[in-house]
Curated annotation (Swiss-Prot):
Annotated SUPFAM superfamilies: beta and beta-prime subunits of DNA dependent RNA-polymerase
PROSITE patterns: RNA_POL_BETA
Protein name: DNA-directed RNA polymerase subunit beta
Function: DNA-dependent RNA polymerase catalyzes the transcription of DNA into RNA using the four ribonucleoside triphosphates as substrates.
GO cellular component terms given for this protein: DNA-directed RNA polymerase complex
EC number: 2.7.7.6
Keywords (A to Z) from UniProt: DNA-directed RNA polymerase, Nucleotidyltransferase, Transcription, Transferase
GO molecular function: DNA binding; DNA-directed RNA polymerase activity; ribonucleoside binding
Gene name of the encoded protein: rpoB
Family stated for the protein in its record: Belongs to the RNA polymerase beta chain family.
Subunit note: The RNAP catalytic core consists of 2 alpha, 1 beta, 1 beta' and 1 omega subunit. When a sigma factor is associated with the core the holoenzyme is formed, which can initiate transcription.
Keyword Zinc-finger applies: no
Reactions performed catalytically: RNA(n) + a ribonucleoside 5'-triphosphate = RNA(n+1) + diphosphate
Length: 1375
């Protein structure tokens, strides 16, 4: 790692022992490769392959009209340049997409009315616009309406055939009922299943069931063929009073004789009754030459006839195939002289009579009846005819338009049923159906195994490209219907393809998919890790997948085939557990959609470097050793017995039987889990929480890479796109906070500019309102290699992921402030902004055109003091950099009010004084409660044709200046490069012509040539033709580059000056971005990487915190009781190693100081060589070493990869090297008393994250606010500015205290006593503190509810009621 730019800046000590052979695939390759394969933007030489978008068009086109007189064919498609680039789309709130143009060919035929022959009459070709196709950004996301979205890959059941049983749940006897199911990619499902009576049924699309023989009849078999397909036959021949039956040892193997077996020829007993026919007996009988055995009539009774027995002369059928032989039938056959009876080989043990029994109960016996039955099931209520029934049956399984197994389905089917159909055969064949029924019957007979649904060989991944392909196909099919109708209704001779096509349905399908599909998700952009994880997510939910409610335990559980493919740790807690997973680090998806993982090949016990990617199905047949199996220097396996996996089982085998070996110990886990050091020492539940919480870490103002990492940090930072990598090698030309200009040095394509300009993002808002800001890492003049990190992004430091901060932790209780996982922090953490983060809130306001007149954005707002307008410019928009608080005006806006008719006098006054204030109201955008911050950006959007205000013009001018600066810098570098190359060619030449004043045949020198302006150098002409050609080519390239540069600049300016596309009725829109600084405070949630989460309970002055002997105070105090029960010991090991890292940092720091003082590098080199391995320091100069040393002053960063990291002994070695106690415990002193604590305390550096659950976003205060309409109680929730609910249990608490008056006002005037609360308000205003509680509104609601039930409830005054009761006469008298 030392040779990269980042490595030169900070070197990580690596503890991994196992060399990694395979390169880890790019982390977002899943998304990018899939979508590229779908779009295939650049058409290859020989045309596009039949996949992705091409296959969609091919499957829908050609389209013919109903009379077949015209045909619309698809030729090719192309993409044009997107109208706006990614950043422009983000800012304007539009979709990043490219226009799709499709070339279509319309062929019109002449049809001869007599013969029906067709001849081509006309061919027209035309490019048709088919809507915009969203493009993927370089980071694997889509920009839809200005927001970044991710399409999550879906796990679903692979197409193919599956065999299963009901686990004995259906029938009360617990009998296993077997079933087979053929699942196509699209089309009807076919189920074949047994019932409790062992009859085989078939269902199509889960409709009513039919006997399976009806399906076989419909396929064109007759009864005899069905039986001969499923059963062997045995022939019985008459031999006097008995029968002869051929002796077949193979068929009778394992058969137990109930009577003596007698040789039909010799009459000898070959097997006595009660004995079993085993291999030895069979051989002996064979040696005796037995060919036939004797059989009696009793043996024949109960057997089934194999073929129709027919009188050859009269055609009379004596017995049909499948009939059971009874004594009566046998006698009848004897009477007519039948001497040979073929029977089915059914012994009721190895071969059951299931198909024969099904045939017997099936009321159909021919194809027609079977087809009618299938038709009635599929379309109940419609009368079938043979033609419609045949057409419907054909379209169910044999029509490529309606039924598609897909290549995957065909491959899976071939593997499961031992067939060999090409994977282009996408429909079912007769042989497939027969093979499925055969395999099912074999299962019932006890042969073969059922399939495991959760095996990764039976589940596949549908990525973006495939999901999009399916969606687009739906859109095109909707379009097809419209095209057919249009073709039939217009004059086909005069129309062009354009007139037939309405691309709206296709565009709508795409828009609907990206906008509202369950798998199109708002990207989690909290930090770079959460982005990467989101793109690598696999969901079993979504259209065509499972639902939370239906998914059982098995689907969610970890399966042995997940090893190296799906992470067993990272999955959400809660209802989605196990349904949403993450791809493992080395996993990739193959062309069939199965997840593959890499292995090293092992030959004769020697491990090679050859890497093979295998899917779960392929892996099953190999013995796979772990990555940590013992090897010697020659890579030979050293153990006598090696622990291996094979087909989900763990077994021990000899080294020479091992076929494969894992590539890396971390191939088991996902990216997030691979970032947890000492993962192997944590309990799985806590590791799960750790993985999930790293994704919620907020980027902090100052990123700090962990002292104890795993080596994955740099990979995540690079692949996530948070840190910027150089696109080409070159030399840094300019650097400032907003951009880096690199002059490319590698020879590049002449059409590309020789300059790369990298714009850095500054204070951009992410989807989660965290702050995206990038800062440069390079200096002017530094050489940069392609792929090196040149700028850090959010949560990255020196090109490494840095989600949190290293803080000094003490594990000890502290006055109960860390009870129940609470966290105690030092004031230093707040003062030094250790856990301060910046959040950017976006507010927008629109000026609409209303019925009463247009709204106006202005500074002139009625009844507002000048003080309130102090932050607004003359256009009424807040300044950048202004500090705003809750209630401040951000954008002034007035809306016209409905006017009352005016008297003539008023009209006159209005005309004279132009008073306008009375007819408008203030609808300005104000800062919502709870927000305080600084304005970082303002964007103004104007509708086309609306005049721009001063602010919009100022923003536009600024932007144009920025673009002009880019153009000028690029031009300068282009000039410098080109003229330098031209000078190289000309110097030393003696031109025959040149600029004015040049003497012919003078030899040019560097001084001589510089006398002329550079633009005149092109006028030199030399004799050498080759050089002249070179100079001309150079000039042509220079002019073209210049022209391209200018054109690009003009295009961008034109886009800026063009009006914006705003929603209908909106004249102007202003977006204001406020940066809010959030310091850590009590109530914020923090966590480590091991699932050790807690809430900050108190921030203590630094002098009260526990401190070490040298006066160093702890930054954070955690409760030691949080560790043992949760079994996440990794955090303790991390603390120890972090302590050692800081100790080593101190030693290196001293050596660096010595070097800076007296320029002696030796002590520093000795120190560094003691810490790092020689390969890590290879090729470092003294300056580079000093810089590396300087960067590790605070602590030497370590990498301890998962399952392959530092062991206890390594930690102790490091502690000793740092001159610390091997126990890593220290004597601590109480900050308040100065006394030492009773025993030593574990102290060290731990990496803590601040999570996105901030108390500022959760808690708010309300005095008055909105009330619910019906109950008149305050609303709830922060968003509604609601109150805190005083619920049932809180009422009990006040009752328990006997606080009657407090309780009364809680339930009345502070809640829903409408009159009462108004009176209280008035009383408070008057300064009076007496009030009376009335009736709560919710009581009235209850009364109304009871009345609606027909129960009249009336309220009466109890005193008056008592008085009335005394006077009232008896009830009957009153009648």
């Amino acid at each position: 790692m030392a040779n990269t730019l980042v490595g030169r800046k900070r070197i990580r000590k690596f503890f991994g022992k196992i060399r990694e052979v395979a390169e880890m695939p790019n982390l977002i390759e899943v998304q990018k490769a899939s979508y590229d394969q779908f779009l295939m933007v650049d058409e290859p030489e020989g045309g596009r392959a039949d996949e992705g978008l091409q296959s969609v068009f091919k499957s829908v086109f050609p389209i013919s009209d109903f009379a077949s007189t015209a045909l619309l064919e698809f030729v090719r498609y192309t993409f044009e340049q997107p109208k706006y680039d990614v950043d422009e789309c983000r800012q304007r709130g539009i979709t990043f997409a490219a226009p799709l143009k499709v070339t279509l060919r319309l062929i019109v035929f002449d049809v001869d009315p007599d013969t029906g022959a067709k001849s081509v009459k006309d061919i027209k070709e035309q490019d048709v616009y088919m809507g915009d196709m969203p493009l993927m950004t370089d980071n694997g996301t889509f920009i839809v309406n200005g927001t970044e979205r991710v399409i999550v890959s879906q796990m679903h059941r692979s197409p193919g055939v599956f065999f299963d049983h009901d686990k004995g749940k259906t029938h009360s006897s617990g009998k296993l009922l077997f079933a087979a199911r053929i699942i196509p990619y699209r089309g009807s499902w076919l189920d074949v299943e047994f019932d409790a009576k062992d009859i085989v049924h078939v269902r199509i699309d889960r409709k009513r069931k039919l006997p399976v023989t009806s399906l076989l009849f419909a396929l064109g078999l007759d009864g005899e063929e069905i039986l001969s397909t499923f059963y062997n036959r045995v022939s019985y021949e008459r031999d006097g009073a008995d029968w002869r039956v051929p002796f077949d040892a193979e068929r009778l193997k394992g058969f137990k004789a109930s009577v003596d077996l007698i040789d039909a020829d010799s009459g000898e007993v070959v097997l006595e009754a009660g004995k079993k026919l085993n291999a030895r007996n069979a051989r002996l009988i064979g040696e005796k030459g037995t060919k036939f055995l004797k059989a009696t009539d009793e043996d024949l009774v109960g057997q089934y006839i194999a073929e129709d027995l027919v009188n050859a002369k009269t055609g009379e059928i004596w017995a049909e195939a499948g009939d059971e032989i009874s004594e009566k039938l046998l006698k009848a056959l004897d009477d007519v002289g039948v001497t040979e009876i073929p029977v089915l080989d059914i012994d009721h043990v190895n071969v059951g009579p299931y198909i024969r029994n099904t045939l017997a109960v099936d009321k159909n016996s021919a194809r027609e009846g079977a087809l009618f039955d299938i038709y009635r099931v599929m379309r109940p209520g419609e009368p079938p005819t043979l033609d419609t029934a045949e057409a419907m049956f054909h379209s169910l399984f044999f029509d490529a338009e309606r039924y598609d197994l897909s290549a995957v389905g065909r491959v899976k089917m071939n593997m499961r049923l031992d067939l060999d159909a090409a994977d282009t055969v996408r429909t079912l064949r007769r042989e497939d159906m027969l093979a499925v029924v055969k395999a099912l019957v074999d299962l019932r007979d006890g042969k073969g195994e059922i399939d495991d649904i959760d095996h990764l060989g039976n589940r596949r991944v549908r990525s973006v490209g495939e999901l999009m392909e399916n969606q687009y196909r739906l859109g095109l099919l909707r379009m097809e219907r419209a095209i057919k109708e249009r073709m039939s209704s217009v004059d086909i001779d005069t129309v062009m393809p354009q007139d037939l096509i309405n691309a709206k349905p296709a565009a709508a399908a795409v828009r609907e998919f990206f906008g509202s599909s369950q798998l199109s998700q708002f990207m989690d952009q909290t930090n770079p890790l959460s982005e990467v994880t989101h793109k690598r997510r696999l969901s079993a939910l979504g259209p065509g997948g499972l639902t939370r409610e239906r998914a059982g335990f098995e689907v969610r559980d970890v399966h042995p085939t997940h090893y190296g493919r799906i992470c067993p740790i990272e999955t959400p807690e809660g209802p989605n557990i196990g349904l949403i997973n993450s791809l493992a680090t080395f996993a990739r998806v193959n062309k069939y959609g199965f997840i593959e993982t890499p292995f090293r090949r092992v030959k004769d016990g020697v491990v090679t470097d050859e890497v093979a990617y295998l899917s779960a199905m392929e892996e099953a047949k190999y013995y796979v050793a772990q990555a940590n199996a013992g090897m010697d220097a020659a890579r030979k396996l050293t153990d006598d017995l090696v622990v291996c996996r094979r087909a989900g089982e763990v077994i021990v085998v000899a080294p020479d039987r091992v076929d494969l070996m894992d590539v890396s110990p971390k191939q088991l886990v996902s990216v997030a889990a691979a970032l947890i050091p000492f993962l192997e020492n944590d309990d799985a539940n806590r590791a799960l929480m750790g993985s999930n919480m790293q994704r919620q870490a907020v980027p902090l103002v100052r990123a700090d890479a962990p002292f104890v990492g795993t080596g994955m940090e740099a990979v995540v930072a690079r692949d996530s796109g948070a840190a910027i990598a150089a696109r080409r090698s070159g030399i840094v030309d300019q650097v400032d906070a907003t951009r880096i200009v690199i002059r490319a040095t590698e020879e590049t394509d002449p059409t590309k500019p020789g300059v790369d300009i990298y714009r850095l993002q500054k204070f951009q808002r992410s989807n989660q309102s965290t702050c995206i800001t990038q800062k440069p890492l390079v200096r002017v003049g530094e050489p940069v290699k392609k792929g090196e990190i040149i700028a850090d992004g959010p949560s990255t430091e020196f090109g490494e992921l840095a989600l949190g901060r290293n803080v000094l932790v003490a594990f000890m209780p502290w006055n109960g402030y860390n009870f129940e996982d609470s966290i105690l922090l030092s004031e230093r953490i707040v003062k030094d902004d250790v856990f301060t983060s910046i959040h950017i809130e976006e507010f927008e306001v629109m000026a609409r055109d209303t019925k009463l007149g247009p709204e106006e954005i202005t500074r002139d707002i009625p009844n507002v003091s000048e003080e309130a307008l102090k932050n607004l410019d003359e256009a009424g928009i807040v300044y950048i950099g202004a500090e705003v608080h809750a209630g401040d005006i951000l954008v002034g806006k007035i809306t016209p009010k409905g006017e009352s008719p005016m008297t003539p006098e008023e009209k006159l006054l209005r005309a004279i004084f132009g008073e306008k204030a009375s007819d408008v109201r203030d609808t300005s955008l104000r800062v919502p409660p709870g927000v305080t911050g600084t304005i970082v950006e303002v964007r103004v959007f104007n509708r086309h044709g609306v005049d721009k205000d001063e602010r919009a013009q100022a923003i536009e001018r600024e932007e144009i200046e920025r673009l002009a600066k880019d153009r000028d810098d690029e031009q300068t570098i282009l000039d410098r490069n080109t003229y330098a190359r031209l000078a190289e060619v000309l110097i030393g030449q003696s031109p025959i012509a040149g600029p004015k004043g040049f003497r012919k045949d003078t030899t040019l020198t560097r001084e001589g040539i510089s006398e002329y302006p550079r633009s005149q150098w092109w006028q030199f002409a030399v004799v050498d033709d080759r050089l002249m050609t070179e100079i001309e080519a150079m000039q042509k390239q220079y002019d073209e580059s210049k022209k391209r540069l200018e054109q690009r600049f003009l295009d961008k300016v034109e886009k800026l000056q063009r009006g914006d596309e705003l929603p209908p009725g909106v004249m102007k829109m202003v977006k204001v971005f406020v940066a809010v600084k959030r310091k850590i405070q009590p109530g914020d949630k923090m966590a480590g990487r091991h699932g050790n989460k807690g809430v900050v309970s108190r921030i203590v002055p630094i002098e009260d915190m526990p401190f070490l002997e040298d006066g160093t105070h702890a930054d954070i105090v955690l409760n030691p009781l949080g560790v043992p029960s949760r079994m996440n010991v990794g955090q303790i090991l991390e603390t120890h190693l972090g302590w050692a890292a800081a100790g080593l940092g101190r030693k290196v720091s001293k050596a660096v100081d010595a070097y800076l003082k007296n320029q002696d590098i030796a002590p520093l080199r000795a120190e560094m060589e003691a810490i790092y391995s020689p390969s890590e320091l290879e090729g470092l100069s003294d300056e580079a070493l000093a810089e590396a040393g300087n960067n590790v002053r605070r602590g030497v960063p370590m990498a301890t990869p998962v399952f392959n990291g530092a062991k206890e002994a390594d930690i102790e070695t490091m502690l000793e090297m740092a001159g610390l106690d091997r126990s890593a415990q220290s004597t601590l002193y109480d900050g308040r008393t100065g006394e030492p604590f009773d025993r030593k305390v574990t102290m060290g550096y731990i990496y803590m994250l601040k999570l996105h659950h901030l108390v500022d976003d959760k808690i708010h205060a309300r005095s008055i606010g909105p009330y619910s309409l019906v109950t008149q109680q305050p609303l709830g929730g922060k968003a509604q500015f609601g109150g805190q609910r005083f619920g049932e249990m809180e009422v009990w608490a006040l009752e328990a205290y006997g606080a009657a008056y407090t309780l009364q006002e809680m339930l009345t005037v502070k809640s829903d006593d409408v009159a009462g609360r108004t009176k209280v308000y008035e009383a408070i205003v008057r300064g009076d503190d007496t009030f009376e509680a009335g009736i709560p509104e919710s009581f009235n609601v209850l009364v109304k509810e009871m009345r609606s039930l027909g129960l009249n409830v009336e309220l009466t005054n109890s005193k008056q009621q008592a008085a009335n009761d005394q006077i009232e006469p008896p009830a009957d008298a009153a009648e």
